[in-house]
């Protein structure tokens, strides 16, 4: 349950930063979330294919968190153009 709360908080922060146009800060927040919630090195998370990243995570809760973070990664990329 703790991970769900942490994920919700991280996604809310990311959404707020993205909406405010603070894209660099959103990217930093996303990196931190990939490491703490997804268990993935942020450098890998920035570059790797979603399918590969999801295959690296066995825990269902972490996999779900990673999926949500990958969706946010795509939104951030779209916001950057």
Regions found by a protein language model. Give the residues of each.
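Conserved small-residue packing positions in alpha-helical repeats and bundles
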Residues: 7, 14, 67, 71-81
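N-terminal alpha-helical interaction modules that lie
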Residues: 1-66
């Amino acid at each position: 349950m703790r991970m769900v709360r942490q994920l919700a908080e991280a996604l809310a922060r990311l959404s707020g930063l993205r909406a405010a146009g603070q894209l660099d800060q959103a990217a930093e927040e996303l990196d931190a979330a990939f490491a703490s919630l997804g268990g993935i090195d942020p450098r890998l998370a920035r570059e790797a294919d979603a399918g590969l990243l999801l295959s690296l995570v066995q825990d269902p809760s972490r996999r779900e968190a990673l999926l949500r973070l990958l969706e946010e990664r795509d939104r951030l990329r779209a916001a950057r153009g």
